[in-house]
């Protein structure tokens, strides 16, 4: 049997970090993942997927990711339930991350937000404005 989930998306808000009574760090965040198709209005919809990460990786997520950061998650789907304050049973489905990959530099998130607001940024990307001729490549 196989339970594996692989996601790439952007954080909807800054990650949260808590500790269990035993001192284990637990990080949580929500990832917005675009669907591969468009709706009737021609717009792409997204799924908002809750992710849980533990120990040192939870600290790293808190320190290096923020709202809008692009991240890759490799983990497993898990369901759990609890009774809320009104005594009703609540079911939760989330991804428990085995690995979280930071897919862009930490400060790049702020640059992306500024670019989307109509401001352009000139970065130190060595691949910007390359004038290479690749026509002689065999593929």
Curated annotation (Swiss-Prot):
GO CC annotations on file: nucleoid
BP terms from Gene Ontology: DNA replication
Pfam families according to UniProt: SSB
Keywords per UniProt: DNA-binding
Chain intervals with Low complexity compositional bias: 106-125
Biased composition (Acidic residues): 129-139
Family matches, as PROSITE patterns: SSB (PS50935)
Every SSB domain range: 1-104
Keyword DNA-binding among record annotations: yes
InterPro entries: NA-bd_OB-fold, Primosome_PriB/ssb, ssDNA-bd
Stretches for region Disordered: 103-139
GO MF terms held by the record: single-stranded DNA binding
UniProt key word Zinc-finger: no
Superkingdom to which the source organism belongs: Bacteria
Subunit structure: Homotetramer.
NCBIfam families: ssb
Protein's UniProt name: Single-stranded DNA-binding protein 2
Organism this protein belongs to: Staphylococcus aureus (strain COL)
